[in-house]
């Protein structure tokens, strides 16, 4: 079984996975942003 959590916790590595630009780059990421907007989240993604 592979490790599932982010072991490298530097800011730049986290933003590559869950930053706004990273989310908007894929269809699934855009879906996440869409659902967070619908729910009324103040923070859509991790700020830069």
Swiss-Prot record:
Main localisation: plastid
Superkingdom of origin: Eukaryota
Subcellular location as annotated: Plastid, Chloroplast
Cellular component, GO, one term: mitochondrial large ribosomal subunit
Keywords assigned by UniProt, alphabetized: Chloroplast, Plastid, Ribonucleoprotein, Ribosomal protein
BP term (GO), one: translation
Cross-referenced Gene3D superfamilies: 1.10.287.3980
GO molecular function: structural constituent of ribosome
InterPro entries the record matches: Ribosomal_bL34 (IPR000271), Ribosomal_bL34_CS (IPR020939)
Pfam families tied to this protein: Ribosomal_L34 (PF00468)
Family matches, as HAMAP family: Ribosomal_bL34 (MF_00391)
Family annotation (NCBIfam families): rpmH_bact
Family the entry assigns: Belongs to the bacterial ribosomal protein bL34 family.
Protein name, per record: Large ribosomal subunit protein bL34c
Organism: Thalassiosira pseudonana
Gene: rpl34
